[in-house]
Each structure stands twice: as structure tokens, then as C-alpha cells.
Amino acid sequence: MSYKHLISACIFSSLCLGQVNAVLAEDKLPPSNTSTGQHSELSVDNDNLWQRLLRNISLAWDSPNQELYIPLNTWHNRWTYDDDKIESYNERPWGIGYGKYRYDENNNWHAVYAMAFMDSHNEVEPIIGYGYQKMWIPAEMDGWRFGVGFTASITARHEYHYIPIPLPLPLISIEYNKFSLQTTYIPGTYNNGNVLFTWMRWQF
């Protein structure tokens, strides 16, 4: 494990988030010959999936709400791996992450985040992204929330020379007040991928 690699990964994630913020700031500026009111009307009329995604990322970025991420487990699917591979892999990653989040008018969760952790080969893996979950809040269970959604993320791995790799993934979470267990499944082929990655989120 290399502390220098982890620090570099965190800096890489921060720089990427900074670039996203700069792009979003430019995206929110109306043309010089268009009034703010006219621009708002045009945004609503011409809204599409990409524009909604950018708007949700921007709103999450501007939110004062913050989250801490702590990786807990990377479980490799025993039905898709040889035993010797399983024995050689790290399934107790250590790392840390930071995010900004908001709940919209429907109580659905939106967040932008950056995280760095030790991967299956004990090499540093950074990841940044946007996450969305549709939340279910049981009326009879005060403080509990259950979520299903997705993350649109970018990661980079040691064996691929830290070239940025797009990584859309599903998300599931169980939450109680400010604490959450969140997980995703990374699909793959035999002896590659097929990992259940779980982490803790703490909102502050």
C-alpha cells in the first residue's frame, strides 16, 4: 500500500470534480443577448435527459449538505472465480470519500462524490461520479429510508495505467437518519469483475 498513491488519487479526484464544477458554472450562464427569464423558459421547453442530468449535478454540487464515505467490503462472487484467485484478492478495502448531496421535492437522493480506496490487488483506485436514488420512506418506520438508483461514474485502475474509465452502475441503500449502507454490483466475466462493493455513508 502506498500513501503517495492514495494522496495522488485524492488530488486527481478533486481536480476532476473541480473541472466538472467549472463546466457546470459555464452551462448555467445565459447567453449575453438573452434575459434570465427567457433563458429559464428555454431551459424548461428544451429540457432533455442530458440537461436534466447536468442540472441535478449542479444542484447537488451547490448544496450545503455533505457526506463522508467509508469503503467496507468488496465481495467477489464465488460462482465466477477460481479459489486461488479469491485467496489472492483483497476484500477489506480501506479508503475514504467525500460527497455533496440533496433530497429533491420527491425525497429522492442526488449526490456528487469522490472516493479513493485499495482495490482487489491492493492498488489505489479513485472514483468520481453522480449518484441518484429513488427513495421509499415507510410511514410506520420513522427515520428509515430505502433507495434504488444508479451512479454515473469515472474510475481509473493501476493495471490500465490509470486511464479514466466510464463506469455506470446500479445503487441500492438502506438508510437510518444520517447513516447509510450503500452498495453496487460490478458485472464482469469469469475471474474478472462480478464484485459486490459496499460502503458506509454519513451525512453531516
Curated annotation (Swiss-Prot):
One of its GO terms (molecular function) is O-palmitoyltransferase activity. The record marks Y190 as: Role in the phospholipid gating. It is an enzyme of class 2 (transferase). Gene3D superfamilies: 2.40.160.20. SUPFAM superfamilies: OMPA-like (SSF56925). The active site is at H76, D119, S120. It catalyses: a lipid A + a 1,2-diacyl-sn-glycero-3-phosphocholine = a hepta-acyl lipid A + a 2-acyl-sn-glycero-3-phosphocholine; a lipid IVA + a 1,2-diacyl-sn-glycero-3-phosphocholine = a lipid IVB + a 2-acyl-sn-glycero-3-phosphocholine; a lipid IIA + a 1,2-diacyl-sn-glycero-3-phosphocholine = a lipid IIB + a 2-acyl-sn-glycero-3-phosphocholine. Residues 1-25 form the signal peptide. It is found in: Cell outer membrane. It comes from the Bacteria. Its main location: membrane. The keyword Acyltransferase applies. InterPro entries: LipidA_acyl_PagP, OMP/PagP_b-brl. Belongs to the lipid A palmitoyltransferase family. NCBIfam families: PRK11045.1. This is Lipid A acyltransferase PagP. It comes from Yersinia enterocolitica serotype O:8 / biotype 1B (strain NCTC 13174 / 8081).
